[in-house]
Amino acid sequence: MNKAILIAVFALIPAAALADAHSELVTAEQHADYGAGSADIAGVHMHLHHTVNCLVGPGGNGFDAKELNPCAQSGNGAIPDSAADKRPALEAAAQKARDGIAAQDLATAKKKATEAHDMLHKLL
């Protein structure tokens, strides 16, 4: 098969088909863990924003374009890029992360980060 045909075929593949939901899940899980281990509320919130951004993707519930999206080059977010049967568990973990972002108490925010991490870890 000549090179031009291969390039044309790959150009027609939708971006979602090239998405790496597993990589997005791993990154979200890592950032939830970083949040759980943070020494201050700003650190917890920052890493939980990264977790949410990786899970929901741009335009998703809680996506914050002002915060880093460590999964920007991996796809459209773990939730939209995952199989339908995994989405409820991913949504539940994203909600824990959003709850942690909303918490103003360090202990509560860290608890929510730990819960999000544990939920995501089970999906790996």
Summary of predicted features, one role per range:
Residues M1, A17-D20:
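Absolute protein N-terminus
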Residues N2-V9:
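Sec-dependent signal peptide recognition
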Residues V9-L18:
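N-terminal signal peptide c-region/cleavage motif recognized by signal peptidases
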Residues A19-L124:
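Mature extracytoplasmic or organellar-lumen-exposed domains after removal of signal/transit peptides
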